[in-house]
Curated annotation (Swiss-Prot):
Keywords: Carbohydrate metabolism, Glycosidase, Hydrolase, Secreted, Signal. Its EC number is 3.2.1.65. Optimum pH is about 5.5 at 50 degrees Celsius and shows an apparent shift towards higher pH values at higher temperatures. This is Levanase.
Length: 921
């Protein structure tokens, strides 16, 4: 639903401001009537500002949702700010133009347009001169029933392309044009595909503007592509800056630096941004600066051939330090620059490489403003974010050692691959592939979006592999090796997205990704026939190497089955099997398949594992995860060891979806992780500023059991580096009802390892752990002897009412081994993961306790249990590992408003207390 806001604050031409009460008017996205608002518009028009020919309009631009500024009127007519937007009204049979001061070369320019007179034309002007006539025009002509892309100069042989549309006065329509070089693309409404796609070279740069002929039109939400981020308004600017498709374009020339300083003022800060250097120029991020940008620090990238070097400079150009090494840089590489300025320590990271390019101590500038700068040549800035360190990964429910995005969302993990010493993690974020890298699977560094939307559509889930022998032929100029990503192309304009498998590749260790021009689509939708491109479910490709048959195998979800393909060159794929259908279907749609081969421990057998996730369905209490064990034939067919209907659950909790394993692991391990959500409530969790977290990475193995070969999962060994000991039970002891072996220990992120034995007589009927306890809150992880059931009960875990479908009790059968049960429990600020009997049974659940609910206890009911061993480890924060672990009081709420005489109990606990929380503060 579009909303046009009427702010009754109008500026007169004499700069006298008339203030009135605020109001808001909301229109539908299309076919909305203007009649009900006519009286208000008339009232507003009577007080609206008008501009004379060629003069700047004294208008309140804040009343318009626009980042295009500095409007001047040309032609015959008037320009007004109304409660619904910017109104242009021409004299009869005349032209009127509003030309802005905003200049752009390559961009997306768009607006919502309402033509109020049936005979009028309304236009977006772009790449215009000052008078508006040396320009391109994107025109909505109601009388002719067309949208028209034309060169304003007219005449024979110049640009003039039309498309028929249905439009009428008083309705709102969205116009959008993308200009990149000589290519011009026009979009109508919310369509993904352009209705006009043409070439024109007459105008390559210029101003943005608006135009109306023979009547009146309203313009609102007038936007041009620009830098994303959380920067506040600039307080100073020098040099040339303009919006661009790539973000904010800065040009430093003739010895004059381009600088833009924003109002964000911080001392300890994490500052990050993406930038593109043009050739051998230099550009960077200003931090702890004065308002003019003449004092403070600058983290600078300097081009050196096909490399870049990092410098820490003072704002006056004095070099404080330079990186010992240089980093790869291709033409149009989008470099990610991250500055951590904490106290006297300054660290600068580039493109996720570790260690830091610069790590030093300096005391010259303890705090200040932040900004961007280009000191020579052209640079483009995008996604610039300034985060006070006190707020960095400290929000309510923010995980401490699980991967979660700093902002935006994380859903399906994609493209997990190891290559040249780094683990690459991609994940879905709004139909794009977000990207992070790690050297240990624990500590992650963010990189720019790897695979954004493209001409084919959105970029949904998929996988990546390392082509180390140049089997694809894509890496002849990059040392004969590189990375290939296979993704689901989804076009919103076509039936069911016309899902097909696209290809992208990287020749620089995953930092820069290119959509293949020679092989943009490697497998078309299987429903394609004749002119019909196909609308079948066909998504989530996962590619794995099959060494025994010297080939690669791809599995793709088909909704109620999995399609298998094989290839010897990673480009040409042959369908070999369709597995599933019928009795295999027990719940929702099949998605996100994975396929890999593992040895069976203690034998010479090797088996193939096919994993899937299933969408939300009442039969499975929402979404679910399961796997099949079998063989892969030389013909490329998967043969299941078990009959259809035999369900092998990957996870017994309710938040483990779209699991994927890493490709090309150097040590033979099979490691996987998943998105911790459920499709009954995928984005409903009560977090602010970010959505979604991933499970801890887990090593997968196959073992013989009394039921047959089954998959086991254990936390990866790398997690041990985060541990600090809290409690170790030196000898076995009996746990009885009423005794708490964990009394006084508090933590929000920790690990419990326990081995518990049921005696032959007098055994407890139930035992386990109460986790994240406080003020009546707790999550139970326990075992019931009757029925041999391990369980997680989160009914009192904290916030649970964000969805009616959020289930609270999860159980799994687990028989004791030698009368013993092993539990390994990993607790974080908003999750609990439980591994029973060395990972034979696994639970993954999210929880949302109050921050102060940090207690823990051991309990037993109806008898006794022998505590053979018990260890508790605090787990270090992976994003703030360098901060001092000083004791602090954690409250259950940060802000509270009370009426006079009202009272409310507050709860608190100690974090990082003496004895790791066991001894108080």
């Amino acid at each position: 639903m579009m909303k046009w806001f009427a702010k009754l604050i109008l500026s007169l031409s004499l700069a006298v401001v008339m203030a009135a009460s605020s109001a808001a008017i909301s229109f539908g996205a299309s076919n909305s009537s203007l009649d009900t608002h006519a009286s208000l518009v008339t009232q507003l028009d009577s007080a609206a500002s008008e501009a004379a020919e060629g003069k700047s309009a004294m208008i309140n631009e804040s009343a318009i949702n626009s980042n295009v500024t500095g409007w001047k009127l040309h032609g015959k007519g008037r320009m007004e700010v109304t409660g619904e937007g910017l109104r242009l009204t021409s004299d009869p049979q005349e032209n009127v133009m509003a030309i802005s001061e905003t200049v752009a070369d390559d961009f997306i320019y768009e607006a919502d347009v309402m033509v109020t007179d049936p005979q009028a034309d309304a236009t977006l002007l772009f790449r215009s001169g000052e008078d508006g006539w040396s320009s391109y025009m994107l025109q909505l002509a109601l009388g002719a029933g067309v949208i028209r892309l034309k060169d304003a100069s007219g005449g024979e042989g110049v640009l003039n392309v039309e498309r028929k549309v249905e439009a009428k006065p008083g309705d709102i329509y969205h116009l959008r044009v993308k200009a990149e070089g000589t290519r011009l693309q026009v979009y109508w409404g919310q369509q993904y595909e352009p209705v006009i796609d043409t070439e024109a070279a007459a105008h390559r740069t210029g101003r943005l503007g608006l135009h109306v002929w023979n009547g009146s039109a309203l313009f609102q939400n007038i936007r041009v592509s620009d830098m994303s981020g959380n920067t506040l308004e600039p307080i100073s600017s020098q040099g040339l800056w303009q919006p661009d498709l790539k973000g904010l374009k800065g040009t430093g020339e003739d010895g004059l630096e381009a600088k833009k300083v924003f109002r964000n003022h911080e001392a300890d800060v994490v500052l990050e941004g993406d930038l593109i250097l043009n050739g051998q120029g230099s550009a960077g991020l200003l931090f702890r600066s004065n308002a003019q940008g003449t004092e403070g620090y600058a983290a600078v990238l300097q081009g050196e051939g096909e490399r870049v070097r990092v410098y820490l400079k003072k704002a006056d150009g004095t070099i404080l330090h330079e990186s010992r090494v240089t980093y790869p840089s291709q033409r149009e590489s989008r470099h990610h620059l991250e500055v951590k300025a904490i106290g006297e320590r300054i660290q600068i990271f580039v493109d996720g490489y570790e260690p830091a390019a610069i790590d030093m101590v300096d005391t010259a500038f303890p705090s200040g403003y932040h900004g961007v700068m280009a000191s020579s040549g052209i640079a483009y800035f995008q996604d610039v974010y300034i985060t006070p360190y006190a707020s960095y990964y400290t929000e309510k429910y923010r995980p401490q050692y699980h991967y979660s995005p700093i902002r935006g969302s994380a859903s399906d993990p994609n493209g997990l691959v190891y290559f040249e010493g780094e683990y690459h993690l991609f994940h879905q974020d709004g139909g794009q592939w977000a990207h992070a890298v790690s050297r240990d699977l624990i500590h992650w560094k963010r990189l720019p979006i790897a695979l954004p939307w493209n001409d084919l559509g959105h970029v949904w889930s998929g996988s990546a592999v390392a082509d180390t022998t140049n089997a694809s032929g894509l890496f002849g100029s990059s040392g004969g090796k590189g990375l290939i990503a296979y993704y689901t192309s989804y076009n919103p304009d076509r039936h069911n997205g016309n899902q097909k498998i696209g290809l992208a590749y990287s020749t620089d260790r995953g930092r820069t990704w290119k959509y293949s021009e020679e092989h943009p689509v490697v497998i078309e939708n299987p429903g394609k026939t004749g002119e019909d491109p196909g609308g079948w479910d066909f998504r989530d490709p996962k590619v794995v190497r099959d060494e025994a048959n010297n080939r690669w195998v791809m599995v793709v979800s088909g909704g109620d089955h999995i399609r298998l393909f094989t290839s010897t060159n990673l480009l040409n794929w042959t369908l070999t099997d369709q597995f599933g259908y019928g009795a295999y279907i027990r719940g929702g749609v099949w998605e996100c398949p994975d396929l890999f081969q593992l040895p069976v421990e203690g034998s010479k057998k090797r088996k193939w594992v096919l994993m899937i996730s299933t969408g939300a369905n009442p039969n499975t209490q929402g979404s679910d995860a399961e796997y099949f064990i079998g063989d892969l034939t030389p013909e490329g067919k998967f043969i299941n060891d078990n009959p259809a209907g035999t369900v092998l659950k990957t996870d017994w909790g309710k938040e483990y979806y779209a699991s994927m394993s890493f490709s090309d692991m150097p040590d033979g391990r099979r490691i996987m992780l998943a998105w911790m959500t459920n499709w009954d409530y995928p984005f409903s969790f009560p977090t602010t500023g970010w959505k979604g977290q991933l499970s801890i990475p887990r090593q997968v193995s196959l073992k013989e059991t009394e039921e047959g070969i089954r998959m086991h999962q254990t936390p990866i060994e790398e997690l041990a580096q985060l541990r600090s000991p809290v409690l170790t039970s030196p000898t076995a002891r009996w746990g009885t009802s009423g005794e708490n072996l964990l009394k006084g220990i508090t933590s929000g992120a920790y690990e419990i390892e326990a081995e518990l034995e049921l005696p032959p007589t007098g055994a407890a009927s139930e035992f386990g752990f109460r986790l994240r306890e406080g003020d009546g809150q707790r999550t139970l992880v326990g075992y019931r002897a009757a029925g041999s059931k391990m369980f997680v009960d989160r009914s009192a875990s904290g916030m649970t009412d964000f969805s009616d479908l959020f289930s609270t009790l999860h159980e799994a059968p687990l028989k004791p081994e030698g009368n013993r049960i092993k539990l390994r429990i990993l607790v974080d600020e908003s999750s609990v993961e439980v591994f029973g009997n060395d990972g034979r049974v696994v639970f993954s659940d999210v929880i949302f306790p109050d921050p102060a609910s940090r207690g823990m206890s051991f309990y037993s009911e109806g008898g006794k249990v022998k505590v053979v061993s018990l260890q508790v480890h605090a787990l270090q924060h992976i994003w703030r590992e360098d901060e001092a672990k000083e004791p602090r009081v954690v409250m259950d709420t940060e802000t509270l408003e009370l009426s006079l005489g009202q009272t409310k109990p507050l709860f608190a606990s100690i974090d990082n207390g003496q004895g790791k929380g066991a001894d108080g503060i």
